[in-house]
Amino acid sequence: MAKTMTIDGNTAAAHVAYAFSDVAAIYPITPSSPMAEVADDWAANGRVNLFGQKVKIAEMQSEAGAAGAVHGSLKAGALTTTFTASQGLLLMIPNMYKIAGEQLPAVFHVSARALAYHALSIFGDHSDVMGRRQTGFAMLASASVQEVMDLALVTHLSAIKSSIPFVHFFDGFRTSHEVQKVELIDYEDMDKLLDRDAVKRFRDRALNPEHPHLAGSAQNPDIYFQGREAANKLYLDLPDIVQDYMDKVGELTGRKYNLYDYVGAPDAENIIVIMGSGADVVEETINHLNAKGAKLGLLKVRLYRPFPADRFVKAIPASVKKIAVLDRTKESGSLGEPLYQDVVNALVECGRADIKVVGGRYGLGSKEFTPSMAKAVYDNLDGEMKNHFTAVSYTHLRAHETRRHLV
């Protein structure tokens, strides 16, 4: 019988991260701080990881220092993780380029939080993780506390196997601090899935005076371009690795995951594409509406980087004619938010440009996102198909509650 425990999303992520880490370089920032706190507490009380050792917890002077420590620790052959959010993640970006470029299997667990624009907000959205999507880190999204537990495991296993670093993110406060009863994955079961040969290959690449090698060189125009393109195969192979581990975790737990999971009517014509905790709201909405005769669908995005267009389009029912893409971030001046642009591009590349796509923003700074708002998005697909709409402010859709609007 599976062991259950009542925990929050941060603790679920830390439980898995502790198992796979030799070192955790940390600096506290809301709402990610509890991950570092519980890891520090476990280390102080003698808890050991999958390698039979206590995790070395290194608290630095800032998130910039933590990212530098992660990079250096990885170069020394230690599996390393960190926990961060918002402005803290921004301070880590310079080192993230190096970590990805040098194919080091770091995992950053991020309680996704709003960035400080016109004002600071400690609450959740995807502004921080979208601000680092070009670094070369893979990105995997969890939508609930149980998913945080399961997909954190997929993340660490995939990073070690692929040599590609990951950002595993989940919505700040909404998921990071939500307390649920979840099925705990034991370290013994995690160990059965760990590729020990991949761990050895990683450790063998460590800087060592017994077999020195050059790292961090400066390259001229004759070779830099080729080196930059050399990692392409790793990213092309990564979706298969992630799906393979999703399947193995599914066999272990009985909870099945895919890179892109479709739920709803098999012959739906209108669907929403979304990632993070908002997917649960949309799923609740379509379950209610479909029970009354509607034919609506939802596509949950889990692997966001890399974004394999063929797998994404394959997950869409052939009957679909209209898609609304919901982003939990704002990219001022762009033709649309990041997920919207990726969806449009994927449909064009895979010959499904006949599908009409609109995009909208929701939930910035943990703004409320309700089933009535999700219904308004579906109604928009049946109506004027307003594009670049929001769930609040000057381009909003009208919700279907007499006393509650999207303003």
Model-derived segments and spans:
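Anionic-ligand anchoring segments at beta-strand to alpha-helix junctions in alpha/beta enzyme folds, i.e.
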Residues: 23-59, 273-299
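Thiamine diphosphate
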Residues: 37-131, 137-160, 247-392
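Metallocofactor- and cofactor-centric catalytic cores in central/energy metabolism, strongly enriched
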Residues: 2-7, 23-30, 34-41, 54, ...
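Conformationally flexible catalytic loops at phosphate/diphosphate-handling active centers
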Residues: 51-55, 166-261
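Short acidic, glycine/serine/threonine-rich loops at helix termini
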Residues: 35-40, 69-72, 92-96, 117-123, ...
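Conserved small/polar residues in nucleotide/adenosyl-binding loops
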Residues: 395-402
